[in-house]
Amino acid sequence: MSVSAFNRRWAAVILEALTRHGVRHICIAPGSRSTPLTLAAAENSAFIHHTHFDERGLGHLALGLAKVSKQPVAVIVTSGTAVANLYPALIEAGLTGEKLILLTADRPPELIDCGANQAIRQPGMFASHPTHSISLPRPTQDIPARWLVSTIDHALGTLHAGGVHINCPFAEPLYGEMDDTGLSWQQRLGDWWQDDKPWLREAPRLESEKQRDWFFWRQKRGVVVAGRMSAEEGKKVALWAQTLGWPLIGDVLSQTGQPLPCADLWLGNAKATSELQQTQIVVQLGSSLTGKRLLQWQASCEPEEYWIVDDIEGRLDPAHHRGRRLIANIADWLELHPAEKRQPWCVEIPRLAEQAMQAVIARRDAFGEAQLAHRISDYLPEQGQLFVGNSLVVRLIDALSQLPAGYPVYSNRGASGIDGLLSTAAGVQRASGKPTLAIVGDLSALYDLNALALLRQVSAPLVLIVVNNNGGQIFSLLPTPKNERERFYLMPQNVHFEHAAAMFELKYHRPQNWQELETALVDAWRTPTTTVIEMVVNDTDGAQTLQQLLAQVSHL
């Protein structure tokens, strides 16, 4: 009996089972213990293969692929700390709803807790973060193939969002020629091998039903809060809110066109909050809100009803409102709850939104990150997409820009970490094949610098704008101790990215003004390669501009 041959047959069943649940993209890191999984993936023509040498980046690459494809994405890594590097991407997927399937190779049980090399306690290591965790036994013909495939099917068939961790121990030898070992074991699955359906099919999840009192609530004074959603959903939500005559407060990830722009500015005005006190019902569609003033208003508002509609399960309401948590696809929910044409009930807020935008426009000429945030809609590629980093940059875009309705916007706003942003952007571009504009800060770029290797392989133009404000300037917006702020919070690194781009043979520009930036962008959109544009700005101007605008708009 060949151990290596049966390892591969066991792995082949696992990988084939994944294809029955829509898995097409598979991300593979180098490793020896994962050889059975890697070879099974390589031999399966249903997969699109992606490779990367850094498991943390690989997990985020898978996250980006899943964001766009809306399908589960598989990841294969070897044993040991390679597995732990998948933790950040798994956490993010659990909070934002992407489906990741982590296939982690492991040592067999007799090599755990005895000093064996690269052997750690992998089962359960991700605690409560996976939606499902499966600890497979070592491959053996004593366990029927139908148990293995139905175990995979059960986990994936009931997976609505988040990650599945499948721990796969393999004994040595891992290498060798294939023979007939385990062939009859494998063939007992019969015509499943020629089929394209799961062995075990789970009943679909039930979504929230139509709210029978909607006809009553839609006649009230309502507010629509739009969080993260798809581009198509964003357009539908904007039309729905307009028909109802309800003000729509749109997050940067809502893709609604933000008909009342600069909400994070005008929500700091007492006239706006006073008018919003008349709200009888808030309908929040989507989660992961960005703006500080929006979150403050959300926490303090006291409508008669607060409804949250999102496809993701869980509470999704840090303010713990009295109301309804409705688990449903947003577009489907809108169909079940049609709008009734009514006149807008807010008077002050549209005026304040217009005045706030004019205040931003009046400051647009200076070459800085706040101005870039406002101008970003002018720089979006046609038929393309935007990926927004975390920390200060996403807050500036949320507060100062007005993105077009239905234009795809992606970000990692679940746990809102700055790790893996370049890798996620790479996955977003690969899955869509669209021209992509990505914008991150300098610390975010440094954190995921080796992901520039992934950006060498793009199918359409990708522009990475690195806003270099020399540190974590978001802490300038917080009451951090002044004497300790620079060393312990901002942590300026005094670096530039020209040599990093050169190392990975990427085009690089460092514009000094808007004309040079726009010229670099025109050139970048012409060829299907990656261009790094480093925008060096004054350290504190972005945060100061936001604070000045907040003060100005609060007194309108």
Swiss-Prot record:
Enzyme Commission numbers on file: 2.2.1.9
Subunit structure: Homodimer.
Cofactor: Mg(2+); Mn(2+); thiamine diphosphate
Name of the protein in its database record: 2-succinyl-5-enolpyruvyl-6-hydroxy-3-cyclohexene-1-carboxylate synthase
Species this protein is from: Escherichia coli O7:K1 (strain IAI39 / ExPEC)
Family: Belongs to the TPP enzyme family. MenD subfamily.
MF terms (GO), sorted A to Z: 2-succinyl-5-enolpyruvyl-6-hydroxy-3-cyclohexene-1-carboxylic-acid synthase activity; magnesium ion binding; manganese ion binding; thiamine pyrophosphate binding
NCBIfam families per the UniProt record, alphabetical: menD
Keyword set, alphabetical order: Magnesium, Manganese, Menaquinone biosynthesis, Metal-binding, Thiamine pyrophosphate, Transferase
Top-level EC class as recorded in UniProt: transferase
Domain of life: Bacteria
Catalytic activity: isochorismate + 2-oxoglutarate + H(+) = 5-enolpyruvoyl-6-hydroxy-2-succinyl-cyclohex-3-ene-1-carboxylate + CO2
Protein purpose: Catalyzes the thiamine diphosphate-dependent decarboxylation of 2-oxoglutarate and the subsequent addition of the resulting succinic semialdehyde-thiamine pyrophosphate anion to isochorismate to yield 2-succinyl-5-enolpyruvyl-6-hydroxy-3-cyclohexene-1-carboxylate (SEPHCHC).
GO biological process: menaquinone biosynthetic process
